[in-house]
């Protein structure tokens, strides 16, 4: 019997610096505490605990591209893990980290990583649009499972189950072609709703890449792709 437990508490300050229909610019600073543990035999044995305290700073931009008829949103975030702050692990992982370094439970709580996202919904014609998704992560540190980039599942490479691969570094990109129901019929479906309001068909292609270092110098890489 194996049980996993994850807890995350988060506080942040969101500030909007520019607010208009065409363009919005905001920043967000935050502090979070995170905990992950895996137990065996109804709690009789623990494989270790990852405890993190993470400070973040984000820049977020979104708007309407009136010239090319598109909606977009992008962000870039710096994450800093802090050693021995608010219960986080020290430089040796309290000798009990869930994530192992070369097989030893010594993952430290300190780390740095950079993440970014960009999404764009592009109108092509009345009934056709394209959806571009991008997410990326970079770190020179070995990360806890709480901080790795996850590939697989409904929000990344959809042909694979959630968490098929997790990496300290990674990227995900997807292109979708969306056809709304108005292409098939301009009539009312029911009430005040037309087919373009209630029906859409999407064809998509996903790609993900991830990379890990295990603390002993070994490197693991994985590529995932799918379409539907």
Predicted features, each with a name:
Residues 1-145, 211:
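Transmembrane beta-strand segments of outer-membrane beta-barrel domains in Gram-negative
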């Amino acid at each position: 019997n194996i049980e996993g437990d994850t807890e995350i508490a988060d506080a942040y300050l969101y500030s909007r610096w520019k607010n208009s229909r065409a363009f919005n610019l905001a920043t967000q600073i935050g502090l979070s505490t995170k905990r992950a543990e895996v137990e065996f035999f109804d709690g009789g044995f623990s494989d270790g605990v990852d405890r993190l305290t993470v400070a973040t700073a984000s820049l977020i931009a979104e708007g309407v591209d009136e010239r090319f008829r598109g909606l977009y949103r992008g962000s870039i975030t710096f994450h800093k893990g802090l050693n021995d702050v608010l219960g986080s692990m020290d430089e040796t992982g309290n000798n009990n980290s869930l994530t192992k370094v070369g097989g030893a439970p010594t993952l430290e709580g300190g780390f740095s990583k950079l993440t970014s996202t960009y999404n764009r919904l592009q109108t092509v014609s009345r009934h056709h649009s394209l959806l571009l998704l991008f997410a990326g992560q970079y770190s020179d540190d070995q990360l806890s499972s709480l901080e790795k980039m996850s590939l697989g599942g409904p929000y990344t490479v959809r042909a694979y189950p959630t968490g098929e691969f997790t990496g300290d570094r990674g990227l995900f990109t997807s292109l979708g072609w969306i056809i709304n129901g108005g292409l098939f019929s301009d009539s009312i479906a029911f009430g005040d709703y037309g087919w373009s309001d209630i029906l859409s068909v999407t064809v998509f292609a996903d790609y993900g890449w991830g990379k890990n270092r295990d603390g002993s110098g070994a490197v693991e890489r994985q590529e995932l792709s799918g379409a539907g």
